[in-house]
Protein backbone atom coordinates (compact mmCIF):
# COMPACT_ATOMS: atom_id res chain seq x y z
CA UNK A 1 0.00 0.00 0.00
CA UNK A 2 1.40 3.36 -1.00
CA UNK A 3 1.36 6.24 1.43
CA UNK A 4 1.16 9.82 0.17
CA UNK A 5 3.59 12.53 1.22
CA UNK A 6 0.64 14.34 2.81
CA UNK A 7 -0.13 11.29 4.99
CA UNK A 8 3.54 11.05 5.98
CA UNK A 9 3.66 14.76 6.84
CA UNK A 10 0.50 14.47 8.95
CA UNK A 11 1.88 11.41 10.74
CA UNK A 12 5.20 13.17 11.43
CA UNK A 13 3.42 16.20 12.86
CA UNK A 14 1.37 14.00 15.18
CA UNK A 15 4.38 11.90 16.20
CA UNK A 16 6.44 15.00 16.99
CA UNK A 17 3.63 16.37 19.16
CA UNK A 18 3.20 13.00 20.87
CA UNK A 19 6.94 12.78 21.53
CA UNK A 20 6.93 16.22 23.14
CA UNK A 21 3.92 15.31 25.29
CA UNK A 22 5.44 11.98 26.36
CA UNK A 23 8.80 13.57 27.20
CA UNK A 24 7.08 16.27 29.28
CA UNK A 25 4.94 13.70 31.09
CA UNK A 26 7.93 11.45 31.71
CA UNK A 27 9.63 14.17 33.75
CA UNK A 28 6.79 13.94 36.27
CA UNK A 29 6.90 10.15 36.56
CA UNK A 30 8.87 8.38 39.24
CA UNK A 31 11.67 6.28 37.80
CA UNK A 32 11.13 2.55 38.21
CA UNK A 33 7.34 2.71 38.04
CA UNK A 34 5.26 0.97 35.40
CA UNK A 35 4.14 4.35 34.06
CA UNK A 36 7.74 5.48 33.66
CA UNK A 37 8.71 2.25 31.88
CA UNK A 38 5.73 2.55 29.54
CA UNK A 39 6.72 6.12 28.78
CA UNK A 40 10.32 5.11 28.01
CA UNK A 41 9.17 2.37 25.62
CA UNK A 42 6.59 4.61 23.97
CA UNK A 43 9.15 7.40 23.41
CA UNK A 44 11.59 4.93 21.85
CA UNK A 45 8.85 3.57 19.56
CA UNK A 46 7.82 7.07 18.48
CA UNK A 47 11.44 7.98 17.71
CA UNK A 48 11.82 4.84 15.59
CA UNK A 49 8.55 5.71 13.82
CA UNK A 50 9.75 9.22 13.08
CA UNK A 51 13.06 7.95 11.73
CA UNK A 52 11.33 5.43 9.45
CA UNK A 53 8.94 8.06 8.09
CA UNK A 54 11.84 10.39 7.34
CA UNK A 55 13.59 7.55 5.46
CA UNK A 56 16.72 8.18 7.51
CA UNK A 57 19.36 5.53 7.15
CA UNK A 58 19.61 4.14 10.63
CA UNK A 59 19.66 0.42 11.07
CA UNK A 60 17.29 -0.90 13.71
CA UNK A 61 17.52 -4.44 14.98
CA UNK A 62 14.58 -6.76 14.43
CA UNK A 63 14.01 -6.71 18.20
CA UNK A 64 13.85 -2.89 18.25
CA UNK A 65 11.37 -2.92 15.38
CA UNK A 66 9.24 -5.61 17.04
CA UNK A 67 9.18 -3.72 20.36
CA UNK A 68 8.23 -0.51 18.55
CA UNK A 69 5.45 -2.35 16.71
CA UNK A 70 3.94 -3.51 20.01
CA UNK A 71 3.89 0.05 21.36
CA UNK A 72 2.47 1.54 18.16
CA UNK A 73 -0.25 -1.10 18.01
CA UNK A 74 -1.09 -0.28 21.62
CA UNK A 75 -1.40 3.42 20.82
CA UNK A 76 -3.67 2.60 17.88
CA UNK A 77 -5.78 0.19 19.93
CA UNK A 78 -6.29 2.67 22.77
CA UNK A 79 -7.19 5.34 20.24
CA UNK A 80 -9.73 3.04 18.58
CA UNK A 81 -11.33 2.44 21.97
CA UNK A 82 -11.43 6.18 22.64
CA UNK A 83 -12.84 6.84 19.18
CA UNK A 84 -15.69 4.41 19.82
CA UNK A 85 -16.73 6.49 22.84
CA UNK A 86 -16.20 9.92 21.27
CA UNK A 87 -18.98 12.01 19.83
CA UNK A 88 -18.64 12.24 16.01
CA UNK A 89 -17.54 15.72 15.02
CA UNK A 90 -16.02 16.47 18.42
CA UNK A 91 -12.41 17.48 18.95
CA UNK A 92 -11.79 14.19 20.74
CA UNK A 93 -13.17 12.23 17.78
CA UNK A 94 -10.94 14.18 15.39
CA UNK A 95 -7.86 13.69 17.60
CA UNK A 96 -8.35 9.92 17.88
CA UNK A 97 -9.04 9.65 14.13
CA UNK A 98 -5.77 11.43 13.37
CA UNK A 99 -3.81 9.24 15.80
CA UNK A 100 -5.23 6.09 14.20
CA UNK A 101 -4.39 7.34 10.70
CA UNK A 102 -0.84 8.23 11.80
CA UNK A 103 -0.29 4.84 13.43
CA UNK A 104 -1.56 3.08 10.28
CA UNK A 105 0.91 5.10 8.19
CA UNK A 106 3.77 4.32 10.56
CA UNK A 107 2.91 0.63 10.74
CA UNK A 108 3.12 0.35 6.94
CA UNK A 109 6.70 1.67 7.07
CA UNK A 110 7.56 -0.40 10.13
CA UNK A 111 6.28 -3.61 8.54
CA UNK A 112 8.32 -2.86 5.41
CA UNK A 113 11.43 -2.37 7.56
CA UNK A 114 10.73 -5.66 9.37
CA UNK A 115 10.31 -7.47 6.04
CA UNK A 116 13.66 -6.08 4.90
CA UNK A 117 15.25 -7.83 7.89
CA UNK A 118 13.51 -11.14 7.17
Where are these regions (language model features)?
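Intrinsically disordered, low-complexity linker/tail regions enriched in Pro/Ser/Thr
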Residues: 2, 33-54
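Terminal, compositionally biased segments
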Residues: 1-9, 13, 98-101, 105-118
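Amphipathic alpha-helical coiled-coil segments
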Residues: 45-62, 81-85, 102-117
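Charged, low-complexity interaction regions
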Residues: 24-37, 58-62, 81-94, 115-118
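Short amphipathic alpha-helical heptad-repeat segments
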Residues: 7-23, 39-42, 64-80
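Short, charged, amphipathic alpha-helical segments
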Residues: 34-44, 66, 70, 91-101
Amino acid sequence: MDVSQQEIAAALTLIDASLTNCENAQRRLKEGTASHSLSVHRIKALRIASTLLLHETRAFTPDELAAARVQLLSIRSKSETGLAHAQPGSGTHTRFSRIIAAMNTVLIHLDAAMEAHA
